[in-house]
Amino acid sequence: MIIERLVGNLRDLNPLDFNVDYVDLEWFETRKKIARFKTRQGKDIAIRLKDAPKLGLSQGDILFKEEKEIIAVNILDSEVIHIQAKSVAEVAKICYEIGNRHAALYYGESQFEFKTPFEKPTLALLEKLGVQNRVLSSKLDSKERLTVSMPHSEPNFKVSLASDFKVVMK
């Protein structure tokens, strides 16, 4: 089965009305536009999203819906650094330092709280800066992502040479 577009999200439906099968994804797999996965019930699916969300797939995104059958995204819990800033200045410092490392940064559950995937160097940096943090297991959902840039991403358009293209050597 090839999935080319999202159908919606489970938060907009009553999941109890449907037979929901899940594709379990790691947080870093949610930004893939082309991939193959197996659902919990063993169905093979291929994803080739034409209009992929800029932030990536989110918890509960519906990949397939037919009558009472749904295949939806489940983002697996992973080891995450929960960061609690004490001031606006500390928020700026956290965003600068995490961004400087090109690490993913997500909104937390409360004001001035952020999450980033666990990496020892990032944890050491936060300790050195005196920023309050704790390592917990939680979901990194794309809809809560602060950073949008996708290094090494493929363009969402086709490139072709114009009919009047010429190479001139001098």
UniProtKB/Swiss-Prot annotation:
Q: Which family would the database say this protein is a member of? A: Belongs to the UreE family.
SUPFAM superfamilies, alphabetized: Urease metallochaperone UreE, C-terminal domain, Urease metallochaperone UreE, N-terminal domain
Secretion signal, residue range per the UniProt entry:
none
UniProt keywords, alphabetically: Chaperone, Cytoplasm, Nickel
Superkingdom of source: Bacteria
| Pfam families named among the record's database cross-references | UreE_C (PF05194), UreE_N (PF02814)
- Function of the molecule: Involved in urease metallocenter assembly. Binds nickel. Probably functions as a nickel donor during metallocenter assembly.
On whether Cytoplasm is a keyword of this UniProt record, the answer is yes
* InterPro entries for this protein: UreE, UreE_C_dom, UreE_N, UreE_N_sf
Q: Where in the cell is it found?
A: Cytoplasm
- What name has this protein been given in UniProt? Urease accessory protein UreE
GO MF terms listed in the record are: nickel cation binding; unfolded protein binding
GO terms for cellular component: cytoplasm
Quick one: a GO biological-process term for this protein? urea metabolic process
CDD domains, per database record: UreE
